[in-house]
From Swiss-Prot:
Residues 900-912, 955-964, 980-994 have a biased composition (Basic residues). This is RNA polymerase-associated protein CTR9 homolog. Component of the PAF1 complex, which consists of CDC73, PAF1, LEO1, CTR9, RTF1 and SKIC8. The PAF1 complex interacts with PHF5A. Interacts with KMT2A/MLL1. Interacts with STAT3. Interacts with SETD5. Interacts with ERCC6. (Microbial infection) The PAF1 complex interacts with Zika virus French Polynesia 10087PF/2013 non-structural protein 5/NS5. The interaction with viral NS5 proteins may reduce the antiviral immune response by inhibiting the recruitment of the PAF1 complex to interferon-stimulated genes, thus preventing their transcription. Residues 1098-1128 have a biased composition (Polar residues). Residues 1023-1034, 1129-1139, 1160-1173 have a biased composition (Basic and acidic residues). The gene is CTR9. Residues 892-1173 are annotated as: Disordered.
Amino acid sequence: MSRGSIEIPLRDTDEVIELDFDQLPEGDEVISILKQEHTQLHIWIALALEYYKQGKTEEFVKLLEAARIDGNLDYRDHEKDQMTCLDTLAAYYVQQARKEKNKDNKKDLITQATLLYTMADKIIMYDQNHLLGRACFCLLEGDKMDQADAQFHFVLNQSPNNIPALLGKACISFNKKDYRGALAYYKKALRTNPGCPAEVRLGMGHCFVKLNKLEKARLAFSRALELNSKCVGALVGLAVLELNNKEADSIKNGVQLLSRAYTIDPSNPMVLNHLANHFFFKKDYSKVQHLALHAFHNTEVEAMQAESCYQLARSFHVQEDYDQAFQYYYQATQFASSSFVLPFFGLGQMYIYRGDKENASQCFEKVLKAYPNNYETMKILGSLYAASEDQEKRDIAKGHLKKVTEQYPDDVEAWIELAQILEQTDIQGALSAYGTATRILQEKVQADVPPEILNNVGALHFRLGNLGEAKKYFLASLDRAKAEAEHDEHYYNAISVTTSYNLARLYEAMCEFHEAEKLYKNILREHPNYVDCYLRLGAMARDKGNFYEASDWFKEALQINQDHPDAWSLIGNLHLAKQEWGPGQKKFERILKQPSTQSDTYSMLALGNVWLQTLHQPTRDREKEKRHQDRALAIYKQVLRNDAKNLYAANGIGAVLAHKGYFREARDVFAQVREATADISDVWLNLAHIYVEQKQYISAVQMYENCLRKFYKHQNTEVVLYLARALFKCGKLQECKQTLLKARHVAPSDTVLMFNVALVLQRLATSVLKDEKSNLKEVLNAVKELELAHRYFSYLSKVGDKMRFDLALAATEARQCSDLLSQAQYHVARARKQDEEERELRAKQEQEKELLRQKLLKEQEEKRLREKEEQKKLLEQRAQYVEKTKNILMFTGETEATKEKKRGGGGGRRSKKGGEFDEFVNDDTDDDLPISKKKKRRKGSGSEQEGEDEEGGERKKKKRRRHPKGEEGSDDDETENGPKPKKRRPPKAEKKKAPKPERLPPSMKGKIKSKAIISSSDDSSDEDKLKIADEGHPRNSNSNSDSDEDEQRKKCASSESDSDENQNKSGSEAGSPRRPRRQRSDQDSDSDQPSRKRRPSGSEQSDNESVQSGRSHSGVSENDSRPASPSAESDHESERGSDNEGSGQGSGNESEPEGSNNEASDRGSEHGSDDSD
């Protein structure tokens, strides 16, 4: 069946030439016809496309190339055909360039396509097909992704459903890792044209894989296979999904799919690489190499080439062909993307094999950057950095290994690596890591702990000072090495030698020198070239003071290794210890002349110290001193340039600055060194020296003392001398003497110490002798010390050490001591005289003190006797008072009985209601009688006031008169009857209205007596002699009955010189002070007649009672205002005891008279109320 034909018009005629597509002639023939007939361009393009469809690409290219030049453009819209011609040819070149393997040919094709697209741009730039072709060309170039994206975007703006543009955008989004966006474009293209080729669904499948939607990806790949059973991409995709399931059946299915893909396209690099990976795990390395090499040569995609090279490299690696493996690993890293780090892992292993740890570290760092928590990479990097000398890298290694041990706590190797890193910085951490490793070995692995680990643990304990633990681990390591020697004798014997050496060092530290020496010599018998043993034996001899023996051991080491720097350094130190500066300097210079040790820090420091030491020797050549300073400074600077953290060099620079006189700068240097480390004793001493030079002696003393405590277990005489010097300059001579004496105990034969002790003794003695306040003991002791200093100086001036001090100076000091001793007798005599005077003065003062003490003792004894006598008198007075009280109580009872008989005839309401209180209303004598109290209360109140004199009683009276009446009235009544006292009204209210009387309980009727107590003495009428019990609180006598008022009126008519008996009846002036005469006359005139003729009304009586009560409280008694009678004066002395006793009783029972007053007032008020009723 004919596919069709095309007509070519003949020139200048109406005829045409018809060419059948099934029988197209050769290209050249067609071109000649087209040229001859001057055929239009669109016919050229149609014929060219037909040739392309039939696979005749050469004719296709020839036709389009000829059409560019010879095509007829003389017709409408020829520009579009012209552009189509150029774009079609360019698209062909782009397609060929994509397939081309040769880089030069590929480059030529791209150049031709670029030229053609540029020419087309000049014709119609914004044609959709032209833009699509140009965008695909940009995608091929790879580095013009954004330009292609812009052109696809432009096309989609004009035609949103343009499928090539949608597929182009999907491709760009996928390459930019925007998998969701790419999937969206694929879906849109599929919706626009559901009949899209299988490649569209293949692209969707890849998007689903990247989005981790594996089931949808499987469906997409399967659908692509349904549409195109030869879609290799879909077969590979499904195969990878099957292989990743890691099950036997899935792996089998995956391999079958790959084989099917290989059958369809044997040159597909993706298929070849996956098959190579499969055969690698089957250990068929020849097939791996064949397939991978074939894949490498069949692709220009670098990612594919990297995969192929990696497969080749690891096949050679596993066959131990490390050179070929290195080559392919390296080539794979050149092609690999940043995410494909497996080649770097293999390459790093190859670098480790070659010993290039730096490049190996870089390779593993790239792997770790892509996979930050990869266990194997961190472990390898940790091991690599652990062996580095760079502390920063060691810190990185520590971090990596800690992460490894956290992720896999049972990894013994990681714990051991971590412990080895921590050995330098964290001994306790290293011990802990070793402990964990040993525990895992014993518990999890069920294996014995290797002797290497035991030796390392012992060494760590040794560094910590745990000598016992260290010995235990060293011995265990030796036992373990002997047991393991059966398997590898040479290796474990070497370990035993190292452990034996460590054990010998331990014995040295434990001061078991004999055992250490024995071990060293045993090692040397088996291994005569073990240089360290010679050095340790020499060091032990040096520490014992056997310098010659030490030198012999060091020379033995030099016979084995003539250029051994440690041996030459130790020999040089022997010379320096003997102050042989020249030979010592030559030894260190010899070390620095060797090429391998020309920058040896220790030797350079030693040379600097030699030049610095020469500055301590006395010299007058300032130029020479300056040269030595500059040389030492230059050496220390060189050391700092080589090692910026060398503290000893910094300390040396500070010392040179101090010698130059720059004390402040030197102090700053020393301070910085001490901040960096406090474990260098020289820095402390240098700081103290600077303080002395700056005259900060207190700080210097503290620094020296701290240095002694921190660094020297025993007394170091050199540092003690520095301390004594600071104390001497500070003026603390006594402390200086004690410090030097301690040093003399350590080094009794040291002549410098002896000189300094003598000098301090001399200065102390001089200061004591010049001080006129010094006592005899101090002066005698100073003379004794001066004699001792003289003997010391005399001895030192003859046999002193000329190298350490000037003997002439000792002789001069001896003469000065002799001069002072010649003047000492004057000072002794002066002190003796002063001492005698002080002794006499002290004796006199002691005598006066003794007299004063005896006088005080005598006065105290007299006072005690007086007090005892007074107490005795008081007791006697109390006894008399008690007797008198008993008599008065008896008398009061008889009087009351008489009064009751006289009042028995009265009647009426008054006698009934007021009768229970009438038994208490007596004459004036009864008013003054005391109320019987409970014995317990009377006794207590009386004893409190016994012994008070009359003046005391008088003061109490005056004081108590100021109390308000209401307060006085409530106490006794409530105390007598038991209930709690009630608050009374203020005095103003009592004046207006008499208070309602409180009723006593029936049990108390007839039992209350007057509380006034009258002295039994007949002649005590004077107010100064007579004291009644209720002193200080005057009575209200106006509250008694009419007969009481009558009796009082009669007493007013009697003379003032009545007998003692009448005065006793009228009451005591002290205990119950009377009203003045004017007041008494008023009472008489107001109350005399009514009491006989009529009964007063309640209101009148209440008024009278309140007025009289107020007057009684405010004034002094009648007897207070009149002079005492002569008879009372004559009996004053005889009655003083009785008066005092009564006064004491009254003042002690202050509540009793108050109760009596209230009783009287209550009785008067009750009478008034009865009458008014």
